Each structure stands twice: as structure tokens, then as C-alpha cells.
UniProtKB/Swiss-Prot annotation:
The lineage of its organism: Archaea, Methanobacteriati, Methanobacteriota, Methanomada group, Methanococci. Homodimer. Phosphatase that hydrolyzes non-canonical purine nucleotides such as XTP and ITP to their respective diphosphate derivatives. Probably excludes non-canonical purines from DNA/RNA precursor pool, thus preventing their incorporation into DNA/RNA and avoiding chromosomal lesions. This is Probable inosine/xanthosine triphosphatase. GO terms for biological process: nucleotide metabolic process; thiamine metabolic process. Belongs to the YjjX NTPase family. Coiled coil: none annotated. Its EC number is 3.6.1.73. Mg(2+) binds at Q70. Keywords: Hydrolase, Magnesium, Manganese, Metal-binding, Nucleotide metabolism, Nucleotide-binding.
Amino acid sequence: MARHKLRIVAVGSTNPVKIEAVKEGFEKVLGAVEVIGVDVISGVSSHPIGLEETYLGALNRAKNAFEKVQCTYAVGIEAGLIKVGEHYIDIHICVVFDGVNETVGLSQGFEYPKIVAEKVLEGIEGGKIAEEISGIKDIGKNIGLIGYLTDNNITRKDLCRESVIMALIPRMIKNAHLY
């Protein structure tokens, strides 16, 4: 029996939440893949502010992962805060890069607690603040602040997976002619 080679997807992170979200998102949309997480530099602050900085972090992660791993696709996921009125909304941006083209997707967003947003704006990484509030060590590699705030009804993996699926929309065969 002939063995088919799985498409390899590199993830610009070693965070198990991001790696599993990429695997689930790709398999739901494009079928079986082998996912490899690699440590890369995002080139942005530890907690990006604004769509552009967050997007740039995801793009850098994807491109840097593509350079490190022989793969079909490379994925970068970056969480960041966007200001809406006087509120700060946490979103995840995913970039899928194939060596030539990139596609982009965003997760749904949620309002960051004011006390957390203020500390992030002072330069403190959101994950550290979330650990203090929740008492959960490495919360960003687990349920995330969203998981804590929603009693696990929505977790960080859900947001990451959602951003991956959104970034894969242009890569679906039925949609290719639209992009």
C-alpha cells in the first residue's frame, strides 16, 4: 500500500495551545497534517497593541517558521490588544504563509479587564498579570485569560483555532478563485 506524505505545517511557536489549535484548524479545513512547532522571534513587543503590531508579530512568526522548517505552510499566531473607544479588546491574529502568499484571519475578541489592560499598557506582559489574577501558572500555555474569565466556556485554544480557520478561508478549494 502506498503511503501518502502528510503536508507539513510549521508553527512559529512552541506554545502547545497554538500548536494544537493549528493542527485542529488545518485538519478541520484542509485535512491531515503534521504540525511542527519552532521557537522564533516575533519582532514585536511581548504584548502587542493595535492591529498593525499584532499582525506584524503573526507575519514575522510565520515567515521565520517557514525559514526554519521545510514545510508546505507556516503559521504565526499573535495575541494583541486593540482599542475600541475606551475599551481594550484582546484578539488573536493568524497568518498562514506558503513561501509566496500570506492569508490572514482574526479570532473573536473579548474585553480585557481594565486593571489588566492598564498594566499591559505599562509594559507588563498580559500572561503574567493573568497568572496573578487566576493563580494558574503558565495560563497562556493553557486556558488563557479568556478561559479563566468564561469558566472554560471559551479557551485560548478556541480563539487560536478560530483565527487559523479564518486564515484558511482563501486556501479552501471552493474559494480559491475569489482571492
